[in-house]
UniProtKB/Swiss-Prot annotation:
Subunit note: Consists of a catalytic RNA component (M1 or rnpB) and a protein subunit.
Catalytic activity: Endonucleolytic cleavage of RNA, removing 5'-extranucleotides from tRNA precursor
PANTHER family, A to Z: RIBONUCLEASE P PROTEIN COMPONENT (PTHR33992:SF1)
HAMAP family: RNase_P (MF_00227)
Keywords in alphabetical order: Endonuclease, Hydrolase, Nuclease, RNA-binding, tRNA processing
Protein EC: 3.1.26.5
Described purpose of this protein according to its UniProt entry: RNaseP catalyzes the removal of the 5'-leader sequence from pre-tRNA to produce the mature 5'-terminus. It can also cleave other RNA substrates such as 4.5S RNA. The protein component plays an auxiliary but essential role in vivo by binding to the 5'-leader sequence and broadening the substrate specificity of the ribozyme.
One GO biological process term: tRNA 5'-leader removal
Upper lineage: Bacteria, Pseudomonadati, Pseudomonadota, Gammaproteobacteria, Chromatiales
Pfam families: Ribonuclease_P
Designated name of the protein: Ribonuclease P protein component
Enzyme's top EC category: hydrolase
Amino acid sequence: MKQFGFTRLMRLVDPGDFKQIFAAGERVSSKAFTVLYHSNSLEYPRLGMAIPRKHFSRAVDRNRIKRLVRESFRQRQQVLGGRDLVVLSKPGINRHPNSDLLRCLERQWIGLVKQCSDS
Protein backbone atom coordinates (compact mmCIF):
# COMPACT_ATOMS: atom_id res chain seq x y z
CA MET A 1 0.00 0.00 0.00
CA LYS A 2 1.29 3.48 -0.78
CA GLN A 3 2.52 5.37 2.22
CA PHE A 4 0.11 8.28 1.78
CA GLY A 5 -2.47 6.84 -0.60
CA PHE A 6 -6.21 6.75 -0.06
CA THR A 7 -7.39 3.42 -1.41
CA ARG A 8 -10.86 1.90 -1.25
CA LEU A 9 -9.70 -0.22 1.70
CA MET A 10 -9.31 2.97 3.71
CA ARG A 11 -12.93 4.03 3.21
CA LEU A 12 -15.88 3.06 5.35
CA VAL A 13 -18.48 1.85 2.89
CA ASP A 14 -20.49 -0.74 4.85
CA PRO A 15 -23.56 0.67 6.65
CA GLY A 16 -22.89 -1.77 9.50
CA ASP A 17 -19.53 -0.13 10.17
CA PHE A 18 -21.18 3.29 10.35
CA LYS A 19 -23.83 1.95 12.77
CA GLN A 20 -21.16 0.46 15.02
CA ILE A 21 -19.24 3.74 15.18
CA PHE A 22 -22.38 5.81 15.82
CA ALA A 23 -23.44 3.39 18.57
CA ALA A 24 -20.14 2.71 20.36
CA GLY A 25 -17.73 5.34 19.10
CA GLU A 26 -16.10 8.09 21.08
CA ARG A 27 -16.03 11.67 19.84
CA VAL A 28 -13.82 14.69 19.43
CA SER A 29 -15.57 17.97 18.53
CA SER A 30 -14.59 21.39 17.27
CA LYS A 31 -16.36 24.42 15.84
CA ALA A 32 -16.54 22.88 12.36
CA PHE A 33 -16.46 19.08 12.71
CA THR A 34 -17.24 16.21 15.03
CA VAL A 35 -15.11 13.10 14.61
CA LEU A 36 -16.48 9.80 15.88
CA TYR A 37 -13.94 7.02 16.22
CA HIS A 38 -13.75 3.39 17.23
CA SER A 39 -10.80 1.01 17.15
CA ASN A 40 -10.75 -1.62 14.42
CA SER A 41 -8.87 -4.90 14.03
CA LEU A 42 -6.88 -3.57 11.09
CA GLU A 43 -3.46 -1.94 11.07
CA TYR A 44 -4.66 1.15 9.21
CA PRO A 45 -7.37 3.77 9.74
CA ARG A 46 -10.57 3.94 7.70
CA LEU A 47 -12.55 7.09 6.98
CA GLY A 48 -16.25 7.72 6.53
CA MET A 49 -17.99 11.06 6.13
CA ALA A 50 -21.45 12.37 6.91
CA ILE A 51 -21.81 15.69 5.10
CA PRO A 52 -25.57 16.36 5.00
CA ARG A 53 -27.38 18.12 2.21
CA LYS A 54 -29.24 20.03 4.88
CA HIS A 55 -26.06 21.99 5.73
CA PHE A 56 -24.93 22.52 2.13
CA SER A 57 -27.53 23.13 -0.52
CA ARG A 58 -25.01 23.00 -3.36
CA ALA A 59 -23.12 19.84 -4.27
CA VAL A 60 -19.99 21.86 -4.98
CA ASP A 61 -19.89 22.93 -1.31
CA ARG A 62 -20.36 19.36 -0.03
CA ASN A 63 -17.65 18.11 -2.38
CA ARG A 64 -15.22 20.82 -1.26
CA ILE A 65 -15.63 19.75 2.37
CA LYS A 66 -15.19 16.08 1.44
CA ARG A 67 -12.01 16.86 -0.50
CA LEU A 68 -10.57 18.77 2.44
CA VAL A 69 -11.38 15.98 4.90
CA ARG A 70 -9.92 13.30 2.60
CA GLU A 71 -6.73 15.26 2.01
CA SER A 72 -6.22 15.98 5.69
CA PHE A 73 -6.87 12.32 6.55
CA ARG A 74 -4.51 11.14 3.81
CA GLN A 75 -1.68 13.27 5.17
CA ARG A 76 -2.24 12.15 8.78
CA GLN A 77 -3.14 8.49 8.33
CA GLN A 78 0.20 7.24 9.71
CA VAL A 79 -0.45 8.66 13.19
CA LEU A 80 -4.13 7.70 13.35
CA GLY A 81 -3.45 3.96 13.69
CA GLY A 82 -6.09 1.23 13.50
CA ARG A 83 -9.27 3.23 13.96
CA ASP A 84 -12.48 3.70 12.08
CA LEU A 85 -13.35 7.40 11.82
CA VAL A 86 -16.54 9.18 10.80
CA VAL A 87 -16.32 12.93 10.23
CA LEU A 88 -19.56 14.88 10.70
CA SER A 89 -19.80 18.46 9.50
CA LYS A 90 -21.53 21.19 11.44
CA PRO A 91 -23.78 23.85 9.89
CA GLY A 92 -22.17 27.04 8.64
CA ILE A 93 -18.69 25.70 7.92
CA ASN A 94 -18.99 26.51 4.22
CA ARG A 95 -18.37 30.15 5.17
CA HIS A 96 -14.87 29.32 6.47
CA PRO A 97 -11.86 29.33 4.15
CA ASN A 98 -10.08 26.07 3.36
CA SER A 99 -7.05 26.99 5.46
CA ASP A 100 -9.19 27.37 8.61
CA LEU A 101 -10.93 24.06 8.01
CA LEU A 102 -7.64 22.23 7.42
CA ARG A 103 -6.22 23.73 10.61
CA CYS A 104 -9.33 22.64 12.49
CA LEU A 105 -9.02 19.08 11.16
CA GLU A 106 -5.33 19.00 12.06
CA ARG A 107 -6.17 19.95 15.65
CA GLN A 108 -8.83 17.25 15.73
CA TRP A 109 -6.45 14.53 14.55
CA ILE A 110 -3.96 15.60 17.24
CA GLY A 111 -6.72 15.65 19.88
CA LEU A 112 -7.95 12.24 18.80
CA VAL A 113 -4.47 10.68 19.06
CA LYS A 114 -3.92 12.34 22.43
CA GLN A 115 -7.31 11.21 23.74
CA CYS A 116 -6.59 7.64 22.62
CA SER A 117 -3.15 7.59 24.22
CA ASP A 118 -4.55 8.91 27.53
CA SER A 119 -7.08 6.09 27.82
